[in-house]
Amino acid sequence: IQSSSMDQGILTEDSMNSFIRTLIQAGIWKNKVPKQTARTKDGMQTTVKKTEAEADARASQDTRLGFQPIVSVDVELLRQQRRFSSPRVLLSENTPLEPPPLYLTEEPVVLNRTSRRKREGKSHRGEYSVCDSESRWVTDKSSAVDIRGHQVTVLGEIRMGPS
């Protein structure tokens, strides 16, 4: 799945809130402990949740080992969020070959001179980015600070598709 800012509308606060709400409901926001399914003697399924102590012990062990959480994301969840777009985020199953460009280089052909004049200067991308200002891929980052100053965890890998 790929998402690019060229073919999608402007990201509104409502669409971002909707996307975050969907992630929360899917149980993948803020390292939520997943529920596990167990079978009883009569064959019925029950849902068992890990205790907080088990989750905390596992999280501290993972942190000591330098483990970054891996989250499975259903491909259909990402397909539903077509209006989510960012010039700094590309959702794809393939590893990128090179870092994203910092400036838009290709200008679309438009017959309207007024529109062309507005775009004459280089269009700056990522002005309000939540990413570090680096023009290379950062692969060893485990935490970052978002635009509101909150500490967030950077996921090492996101699995898409059936588990």
UniProtKB/Swiss-Prot annotation:
Glycans are attached at N112. Seems to promote the survival of visceral and proprioceptive sensory neurons. The lineage of its organism: Eukaryota, Metazoa, Chordata, Craniata, Vertebrata. Residues 36-61 are annotated as: Disordered. PANTHER family: NERVE GROWTH FACTOR NGF -RELATED (PTHR11589), NEUROTROPHIN-3 (PTHR11589:SF4). It is found in: Secreted. Its main location: secreted. Residues 49-61 have a biased composition (Basic and acidic residues). It comes from the Eukaryota. Keywords: Cleavage on pair of basic residues, Glycoprotein, Growth factor, Secreted, Signal. InterPro entries: Cystine-knot_cytokine (IPR029034), Nerve_growth_factor-like (IPR020408), Nerve_growth_factor-rel (IPR002072), Neurotrophin-3 (IPR015578), NTF3_N (IPR045815). One of its GO terms (cellular component) is synaptic vesicle. GO terms for biological process: cell surface receptor protein tyrosine kinase signaling pathway; modulation of chemical synaptic transmission; negative regulation of neuron apoptotic process; nerve development; nerve growth factor signaling pathway; neuron projection morphogenesis. One of its GO terms (molecular function) is nerve growth factor receptor binding. It comes from Boa constrictor (Boa). This is Neurotrophin-3. The gene is NTF3. Belongs to the NGF-beta family. Residues 1-3 form the signal peptide.
